[in-house]
């Protein structure tokens, strides 16, 4: 079992508090002036990736104290527990073993004394056989035409992870093969997705462990109806629908061949499941060999995380620096800013991974947490964000620690595009750190012929105070291995934060209440009766909806 220690009561936390009082006003620019080797000392290399944490409001003592906190709260022991299959998801009585899905070593991974690896390898082989047929063009539909479009129907982890990876690794896709993702129960999502598709060349992947997930099965039923309107014969469903599920009876009742049912396990959380059969859409789209490379990248980072001392452990360092900002500087948000269009869904993916994992207010003792937990995670690809919210990053009243991610080599070299992109990335990180003081702004404005009252009036608006922290992750190219390593790095960062904060990171009870209430409201929408069973606001909203719908229907 994980330690159950209130971190705020530890000696290391208290020492960090005293240390914060002494360093909170330190200027990062001064730290660089004092230490010409700061970048060299505070950047970490891993495979084809460098993680630079030098632009943070930290000193060597800060890092030492943060590592003391990690040790005192049992981070190293928690890492070992996860890898050996202990039931660290205590509220659900489950192991947490997404690392087993990408375990490429010839070593067992045990749950209750049973090795899960034969089952993992069995599903991977099933995925290999099926995805190879799709990727190679051998998989045909009822009219013997090659499959050209894959539609993945899922929600949450069954959607965000595969969608993010498929988008990021699109350069590895087979020409003529397209992938689409449907998650929202809003009918517009599936209707717009299916427009222009041909039932005879479309493959549907239904991702629902229980095959009862309301949003997913509603969309699946609509997809089946659309398909049959074109195909006619219900017998053709088996050639065009596959399931990622463990409910064989429901899968077969839907019309899916049991041989096309891909299983996974309760020790895989949804937001950590892209490495499992949930990644089937990715394997079909980019080919199984490239999917295996994704697993290899994750596995390599797992080995680093499991075996590297805390001080040099990239996920641990990132986690502890984040805790420094969340709990001592009281910075409530973090921005994820990928300077690679392929990573356009990465901020949303991390938003779920972080906020669903660590957005908790009850600690492992069952008490209310007295300290902040998960930051709000958000972001957009550069340079789009620069023309949207970077104004706040540079001059707003809230300081937002940022993660910049940028490749050295683009998959789509085009003139000066990539060099301009990279220049913007590095410039933004530098500007956040250095800012621009009054003297520099005055010189610049004077050189442009501005002086006197106008200069004095505009000067305060053009000053950037700087000292705003960021990490920069530079990688050679967005390959499957690099992406796998980056995803695993952030997964482990999130895990370490949850351990230190004394919360359970692998449940999501906060999702359940809204789902239960929706099940109560849904039948109340079917008639014209006035609803009085909820609070005044909810009753009012339901009844307004009914009135509006009724008027629309009559018109």
Curated annotation (Swiss-Prot):
InterPro entries given in the database record: G6P_Isomerase (IPR001672), G6P_Isomerase_C (IPR023096), Phosphoglucose_isomerase_CS (IPR018189), SIS_dom_sf (IPR046348), SIS_PGI_1 (IPR035476), SIS_PGI_2 (IPR035482)
Entry keyword set: Cytoplasm, Gluconeogenesis, Glycolysis, Isomerase
Residue positions of the active site: 356 (proton donor), 387, 515
Molecular-function annotations in GO: carbohydrate derivative binding; glucose-6-phosphate isomerase activity; monosaccharide binding
Recorded superkingdom: Bacteria
Enzyme class of the recorded protein, top EC level: isomerase
Record-listed E.C. numbers: 5.3.1.9
Catalyzed reaction equations: alpha-D-glucose 6-phosphate = beta-D-fructose 6-phosphate
Localization, UniProt: Cytoplasm
Pathway(s) of this molecule: Carbohydrate biosynthesis; gluconeogenesis; Carbohydrate degradation; glycolysis; D-glyceraldehyde 3-phosphate and glycerone phosphate from D-glucose: step 2/4
Any single biological process term in GO: glucose 6-phosphate metabolic process
UniProt-listed Gene3D superfamilies: 1.10.1390.10, Glucose-6-phosphate isomerase like protein, domain 1 (3.40.50.10490)
GO cellular component terms given for this protein: cytosol
Functional summary from the UniProt entry: Catalyzes the reversible isomerization of glucose-6-phosphate to fructose-6-phosphate.
PANTHER family named in the record: GLUCOSE-6-PHOSPHATE ISOMERASE
Family: Belongs to the GPI family.
NCBIfam families: PRK00179.1 (NF001211)
Name recorded for this polypeptide: Glucose-6-phosphate isomerase
Origin species: Desulforapulum autotrophicum (strain ATCC 43914 / DSM 3382 / VKM B-1955 / HRM2) (Desulfobacterium autotrophicum)
């Amino acid at each position: 079992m994980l330690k159950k220690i209130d971190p705020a009561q530890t000696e290391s936390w208290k020492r960090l508090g005293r240390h914060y009082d002494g360093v909170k006003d330190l200027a990062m620019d001064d730290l660089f002036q004092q230490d010409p080797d700061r970048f060299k000392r505070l950047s970490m290399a891993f495979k084809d990736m460098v993680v630079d944490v030098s632009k943070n409001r930290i000193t060597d003592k800060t890092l030492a104290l943060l590592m003391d906190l990690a040790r005192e709260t049992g981070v190293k022991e928690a890492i070992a527990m996860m890898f050996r299959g202990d039931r660290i998801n205590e509220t659900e009585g489950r192991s947490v073993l997404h690392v087993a899905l990408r375990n490429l070593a010839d070593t067992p991974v045990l749950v209750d004394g049973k090795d899960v690896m034969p089952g993992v390898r069995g599903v991977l082989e099933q995925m290999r056989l099926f995805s190879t047929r799709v990727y190679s063009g051998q998989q045909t539909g009822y009219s013997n035409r090659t499959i050209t479009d894959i539609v993945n129907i899922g929600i949450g982890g069954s959607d965000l992870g595969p969608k993010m990876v498929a988008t990021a690794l699109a350069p590895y896709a087979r020409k003529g093969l397209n992938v689409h993702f449907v998650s929202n129960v809003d009918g517009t999502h599936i209707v717009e997705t299916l427009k222009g598709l041909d039932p005879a060349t479309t493959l549907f992947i239904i991702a629902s462990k229980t095959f009862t997930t309301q949003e997913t099965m509603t969309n699946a039923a609509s997809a089946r109806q659309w398909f049959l309107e074109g195909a006619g014969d219900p017998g053709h469903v088996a050639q065009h629908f596959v399931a990622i599920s463990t409910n064989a009876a429901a899968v077969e009742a839907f019309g899916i061949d049991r041989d096309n049912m891909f299983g996974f396990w309760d020790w895989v959380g949804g937001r950590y499941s892209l490495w499992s059969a949930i990644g089937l859409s990715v394997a079909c789209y980019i080919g199984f060999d490239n999917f295996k490379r994704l697993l290899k990248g994750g596995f390599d980072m797992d080995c680093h995380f499991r075996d590297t001392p805390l001080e040099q452990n990239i996920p641990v360092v990132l986690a502890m620096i984040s805790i420094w900002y969340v709990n001592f500087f009281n910075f409530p948000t973090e921005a994820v800013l990928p300077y690679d269009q392929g990573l356009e869904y990465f901020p949303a993916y991390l938003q779920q991974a972080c906020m669903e994992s660590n957005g908790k207010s009850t600690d492992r003792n069952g008490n209310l947490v007295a300290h902040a937990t998960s930051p709000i995670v958000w972001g957009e690809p550069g340079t789009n964000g620069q023309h949207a919210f970077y104004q706040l990053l540079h001059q707003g009243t809230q300081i937002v620690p940022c993660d910049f991610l940028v490749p050295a080599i683009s998959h789509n070299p085009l003139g000066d595009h990539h060099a301009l992109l990279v220049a913007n990335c590095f410039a933004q990180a530098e500007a956040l750190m250095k800012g621009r003081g009054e003297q520099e702004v005055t010189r610049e404005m004077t050189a442009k012929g501005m002086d006197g009252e106008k200069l004095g009036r505009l000067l305060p608006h053009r000053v950037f105070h700087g000292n705003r922290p960021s990490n920069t992750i530079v990688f050679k190219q967005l390959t499957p291995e690099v992406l796998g390593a980056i995803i695993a790095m952030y997964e482990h960062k999130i895990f370490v934060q949850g351990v230190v904060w004394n919360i359970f990171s692998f449940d999501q009870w906060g999702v359940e209440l809204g789902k239960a209430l929706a099940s109560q409201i849904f039948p109340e929408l079917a008639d014209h009766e006035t609803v009085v069973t909820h609070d005044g606001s909810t009753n009012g909203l339901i009844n307004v909806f009914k009135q509006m719908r009724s008027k629309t229907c009559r018109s």
